[in-house]
């Protein structure tokens, strides 16, 4: 299956608990942390929820 690289660009401090949990679900912990994930609708939905804190590095 295709993969997607996601990078955390902003801190989770002071964010909604749901958004913090979404970052944890994506496996992101710190600013500039990059994870390679499977490109599924569930992962895309999680990225859309926290789009202001992450960026897609590579598809």
Swiss-Prot record:
Gene Ontology cellular-component terms listed: cytosolic large ribosomal subunit
UniProt-listed InterPro entries: Ribo_uL30_ferredoxin-like_sf, Ribosomal_uL30_bac-type, Ribosomal_uL30_CS, Ribosomal_uL30_ferredoxin-like
Gene3D superfamilies registered for this protein in UniProt: Ribosomal protein L30, ferredoxin-like fold domain
Gene Ontology annotations of biological process type: translation
CDD domains for the chain: Ribosomal_L30
UniProt GO MF annotations: structural constituent of ribosome
Annotated keywords: Ribonucleoprotein, Ribosomal protein
Pfam families: Ribosomal_L30
Stated family: Belongs to the universal ribosomal protein uL30 family.
Subunit structure of this chain's protein: Part of the 50S ribosomal subunit.
PANTHER family with a match to the protein in the record: LARGE RIBOSOMAL SUBUNIT PROTEIN UL30M (PTHR15892:SF2), MITOCHONDRIAL RIBOSOMAL PROTEIN L30 (PTHR15892)
Identification of the protein by name: Large ribosomal subunit protein uL30
Native organism: Alteromonas mediterranea (strain DSM 17117 / CIP 110805 / LMG 28347 / Deep ecotype)
